[in-house]
A protein has these predicted regions:
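PRPP-associated nucleotide enzymes
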Residues: 1-100
Length: 100
């Protein structure tokens, strides 16, 4: 069963019209700066996926790295970073696609 995550909204700041009118940026730095809230978020995410017995957690770009790496650790799983082409050093896997 999924954890109730409604509490996390109290720790995410909304910045209206960020860079352009109509865009709302969700700032997670208040969540990251609060040890208890950050720990609870990681624990709740880990609880949601514990029964799935995952072997890898995939984190997309920067926010995914911040949240998903600790979740992977909690689940005792590996972590796979996903970034735009040319942003990761060393050997990488690549998938090309077209938008619909």
């Amino acid at each position: 069963m999924a954890a109730d995550a409604s509490w996390v909204r109290e720790h995410i700041r909304a910045i209206e019209d960020y860079h352009e009118p109509g865009v709302t940026y969700r700032d997670i730095t208040p969540l990251l700066g609060n040890e208890a809230a950050f720990g609870r978020a990681i624990d709740d995410l880990g609880t949601c996926f514990h029964a799935a017995q995952v072997s890898r957690v995939v984190g997309v770009e920067s926010r995914g790295f911040i949240l998903d790496a600790p979740v992977a650790y909690r689940l005792r799983a590996g972590f796979v970073p996903v970034r735009k082409a040319g942003k990761l050093p060393w050997a990488v896997a690549r998938e090309e696609y077209e938008l619909e």
